[in-house]
Regions:
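A generic structural signal for alpha->beta connector loops
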Residues: 8, 45-47
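Structural beta-sheet core signal
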Residues: 11, 50-52
Length: 108
């Protein structure tokens, strides 16, 4: 399962961050999650949203479907990252990711 929430209107991928919303200039959306969720959204004619909840209580949302329609998705980059997010394992791999800026989304 690549999403956290699903209803008749949308798919939501939800991340809980240990930083504040303004700690970093951008936030990671992995290409594999993008690909699978956009495929589901298109198949069911619903929207795909990416949400981040930050340590300071703010929740930010990016309307990925709308960003794609407006050709506003950032370019895809390769980034060396932990193989698994919440596993104590120092092994790194290269992942393809989109780096989403706060100004491409909105607070909800």
């Amino acid at each position: 399962k690549t999403y956290d929430f699903w209803n008749e209107k949308c798919i939501i991928e939800f991340k809980k961050r240990t930083c504040n919303h303004d700690t970093f200039p951008d936030f990671i959306l992995q290409k594999d999650k993008y690909d699978m969720n956009m495929e589901l959204a298109k198949k069911h004619k619903i929207s795909f949203y990416y949400q981040n909840k930050f340590a300071n209580g703010k929740i930010w949302e990016w309307d990925i479907t709308d960003m794609v329609e407006r050709n506003d998705l950032p370019r895809l980059i390769n980034k060396e990252m932990n193989r698994y997010t919440y596993v104590d394992n120092p092994n790194k791999i290269v992942k393809q990711v989109y780096m989403l800026r706060l100004d491409q989304g909105y607070e909800i």
